[in-house]
């Protein structure tokens, strides 16, 4: 191995960006094929390829950062900046949905009956399942912070327990959201109300699933002694992402469920 006189990580050539891009193409085009031709083959292929890419890319990063020592302080600083910029881009992504919602609701057109919610729409009670979901996500924010402090203090078992609890709360939120969708008195096809509701809450739900997966990988890594009290950026990034998902839900709850109903 050649001597490296700097602290930066010179990344080896990797096939995973290419396979990830192909998986994304197959999934998005597969979604369109599913909607129009009722065939899920292309989307299933994309999903399988995406899962394989995720597994192998994460495996490579864990090898480089945990076992080969490539994640030096300057590299970790770069990763932190990257995660902050990624979350900032996600903020603007959700800002688009809130903009669409408020554009439609603050000045409802005559086609909507000049009122919000539009004429004929029966809304969900914000003080039933949505309020429970809010409590579940806020509790998960507490447990993920507990996990973070446990890792920093070297309390391995506490970290495992609190992280497991966070993941279970995440899956419980997803389950409740699925029930709510199933029982909703309106659909995504019910005009601007249905589309803004399901697209905004649906993308948030997708982010909860992604965050739960992220935390599940961190749990496996914690069980296998990958984290130390000083070196655990993988978990830190997952915790930041989870807090972001929490905050987005609070805005969704106040805007769409409570004020919008």
Swiss-Prot record:
* InterPro entries named among the record's database cross-references: Cyt_c/ubiquinol_Oxase_su3, Cyt_c_oxase_su3_dom, Cyt_c_oxidase-like_su3, Cyt_c_oxidase_su3-like_sf, Cyt_c_oxidase_su3_a-hlx
Q: Per UniProt, what is the membrane topology?
A: Multi-pass membrane protein
Which Gene Ontology cellular component terms are annotated? mitochondrial inner membrane; respiratory chain complex IV
Q: For this entry, list what GO says about its biological process.
A: mitochondrial electron transport, cytochrome c to oxygen
Residue intervals on the Mitochondrial matrix side: 1-15, 67-72, 153-155, 224-232
Where does this polypeptide localize?
Mitochondrion inner membrane
Catalyzed chemical reaction(s): 4 Fe(II)-[cytochrome c] + O2 + 8 H(+)(in) = 4 Fe(III)-[cytochrome c] + 2 H2O + 4 H(+)(out)
Q: Does the keyword Mitochondrion apply?
A: yes
State the EC number(s).
7.1.1.9
One GO molecular function term of this record is: cytochrome-c oxidase activity
Membrane side Mitochondrial intermembrane: which residues? 35-40, 106-128, 184-190, 257-261
**Alphabetical list of CDD domains matching this protein:** Cyt_c_Oxidase_III
Alphabetized UniProt keyword annotations: Membrane, Mitochondrion, Mitochondrion inner membrane, Translocase, Transmembrane, Transmembrane helix
| Matching Pfam families | COX3
- UniProt superkingdom: Eukaryota
| Transmembrane portions of the chain | 16-34, 41-66, 73-105, 129-152, 156-183, 191-223, 233-256
Please give the subunit comment from the record: Component of the cytochrome c oxidase (complex IV, CIV), a multisubunit enzyme composed of 14 subunits. The complex is composed of a catalytic core of 3 subunits MT-CO1, MT-CO2 and MT-CO3, encoded in the mitochondrial DNA, and 11 supernumerary subunits COX4I, COX5A, COX5B, COX6A, COX6B, COX6C, COX7A, COX7B, COX7C, COX8 and NDUFA4, which are encoded in the nuclear genome.
The UniProt family comment states:
Belongs to the cytochrome c oxidase subunit 3 family.
| Function of the molecule | Component of the cytochrome c oxidase, the last enzyme in the mitochondrial electron transport chain which drives oxidative phosphorylation. The respiratory chain contains 3 multisubunit complexes succinate dehydrogenase (complex II, CII), ubiquinol-cytochrome c oxidoreductase (cytochrome b-c1 complex, complex III, CIII) and cytochrome c oxidase (complex IV, CIV), that cooperate to transfer electrons derived from NADH and succinate to molecular oxygen, creating an electrochemical gradient over the inner membrane that drives transmembrane transport and the ATP synthase.
Name of the protein in its database record: Cytochrome c oxidase subunit 3
Q: Which organism is it from?
A: Gadus morhua (Atlantic cod)
């Amino acid at each position: 191995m050649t001597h490296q006189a700097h602290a930066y990580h010179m990344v080896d050539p990797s096939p995973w960006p290419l396979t990830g891009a192909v998986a994304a193409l197959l999934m998005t085009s597969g979604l369109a094929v599913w909607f129009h031709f009722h065939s899920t083959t292309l989307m299933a292929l994309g999903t399988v390829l995406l899962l394989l890419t995720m597994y192998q890319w994460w495996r490579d990063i864990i090898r480089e950062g945990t076992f080969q020592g490539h994640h030096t302080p300057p590299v970790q600083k770069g990763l932190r900046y990257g995660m902050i910029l990624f979350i900032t881009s996600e903020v603007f992504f959700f800002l688009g949905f809130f903009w669409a919602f408020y554009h439609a609701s603050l000045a409802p057109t005559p086609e909507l009956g000049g009122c919000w919610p539009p004429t004929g729409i029966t809304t969900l009670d914000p003080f039933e399942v949505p309020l429970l979901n809010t409590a579940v996500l806020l509790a998960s924010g507490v447990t993920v912070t507990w996990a973070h402090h446990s890792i920093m203090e070297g309390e391995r078992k506490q970290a495992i327990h609190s992280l497991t609890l966070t993941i279970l709360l995440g899956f419980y939120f997803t389950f409740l959201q699925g029930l709510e969708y199933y029982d909703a008195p309106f659909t995504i096809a019910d005009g601007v109300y249905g589309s803004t509701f399901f697209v905004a809450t649906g993308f948030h739900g997708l982010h909860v699933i992604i965050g739960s997966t992220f935390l599940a990988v961190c749990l496996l890594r914690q069980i296998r002694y990958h984290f130390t009290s000083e070196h655990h950026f993988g978990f830190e990034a997952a915790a930041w992402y989870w807090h972001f998902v929490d905050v987005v839900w609070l805005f969704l709850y106040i805007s769409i469920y409570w004020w919008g109903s």
